[in-house]
């Protein structure tokens, strides 16, 4: 078992599937995930039509997600929960309409080539920096593809490298947000939009709903600089350790039939056992589809791994790798 679970789980019969009328601060319920993660609605922002979900158990206890109200059906609430008046529900529906415009950015091979040139140039700088400053290399360490944890010296190297590039705040925010929930709030959405504009992935989703998504440290120019610098660091350290590609695994269970995976960021793992834990292949499983697969992937398509990312070794032990998926495999 790789994740915390309820000792005794309450029956779904005590709950009702979430609807807009349940978006009332204080309402308690659970996420409709496999382990029924409990929490409550802490607040609701009328302008963005997003609610704060405060988690009350498991690894992320005390932390919160920012969730669009349209996803309320992914939650369940106690049957005695407070409900909104119909007029307030209609107001939410009306406000949500302005966020239903879709933004589509297909993969551009021309933009991808330009970005790769930038990364190649930055990799030379990252390689020189690592040779001069890396505690990981000075201690004669290498990346062990069978390791269960990352390395503190490599965490430190990444941190110092990001400081030298003026990008540490982006690294910390991106790593923590991806660990907590990449679909919470709009920080990762902003990253995906910039990645798509750079040709790294495609973006096919809704327009941003928060005004500050591309302000402060999140301006597009700084986000792109971060994306290039991080890719360069990963390529440099893996190449210095003699790795051109890495063995990865992915496991998945779903309540819906399999569908084509788009060109986007995809979570994978270096551990076969972790991948198997995400694939409910036993006869008692109620999922409609599942799989687990092993594949080799070029280090050029890695975004984050547990080797250099401290946050990926704290609350969860999943030996995770986030990849730029460009339809080179069939999931």
Predicted ranges, named:
Residues 66-83:
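Repeat-associated, polar segments at repeat-unit boundaries in modular proteins
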Residues 52, 59-61, 73, 137, ...:
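Amphipathic alpha-helical interaction segments
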Residues 25-69:
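Basic/aromatic-rich interaction segments and small domains that mediate binding to polyanionic partners
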Residues 2-8, 12-13, 19-27, 43, ...:
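Mono-ADP-ribosyltransferase
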């Amino acid at each position: 078992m790789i994740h915390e679970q309820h000792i005794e789980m309450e029956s779904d019969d005590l709950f009702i599937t979430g609807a807009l009328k349940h978006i009332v601060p204080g309402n308690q319920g659970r996420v409709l995930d496999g382990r029924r993660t409990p929490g409550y609605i802490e607040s609701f922002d009328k302008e963005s039509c997003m609610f704060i979900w405060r988690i009350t158990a498991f690894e992320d206890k005390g932390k919160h997600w920012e969730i669009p109200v349209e996803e309320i059906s992914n939650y369940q609430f106690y049957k005695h929960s407070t409900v909104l008046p119909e007029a307030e529900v209609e107001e939410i529906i009306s406000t949500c309409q302005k966020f239903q415009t879709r933004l589509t950015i297909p993969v551009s091979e021309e933009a991808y080539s330009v970005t790769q040139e930038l990364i190649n140039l930055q990799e030379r700088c990252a390689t020189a920096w690592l040779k001069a400053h890396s505690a990981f290399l000075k201690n004669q360490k290498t990346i062990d593809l069978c390791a269960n944890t990352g390395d503190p010296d490599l965490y430190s190297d990444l941190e110092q490298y990001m400081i030298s590039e003026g990008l540490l705040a982006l690294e910390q925010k991106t790593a923590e947000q991806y660990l907590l929930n990449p679909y919470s709030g709009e920080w990762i959405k902003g990253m995906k939009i910039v990645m798509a504009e750079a040709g790294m992935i495609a973006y096919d989703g809704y327009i941003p709903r928060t005004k500050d998504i591309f302000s402060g440290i999140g301006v597009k120019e700084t986000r792109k600089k971060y994306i290039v610098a991080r890719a360069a660091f990963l390529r440099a350290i893996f190449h210095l350790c003699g790795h051109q590609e890495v063995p990865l695994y992915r496991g998945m269970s779903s309540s819906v039939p399999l569908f084509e995976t788009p060109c986007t960021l995809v979570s994978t793992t270096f551990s076969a056992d972790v991948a198997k834990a995400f694939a409910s292949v036993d006869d008692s499983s109620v999922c409609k589809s599942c799989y687990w697969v092993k594949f080799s992937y070029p280090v050029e398509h890695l975004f984050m791994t547990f080797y250099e990312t401290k946050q990926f070794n704290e609350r969860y032990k999943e030996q995770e790798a986030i990849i730029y998926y460009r339809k080179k495999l069939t999931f």
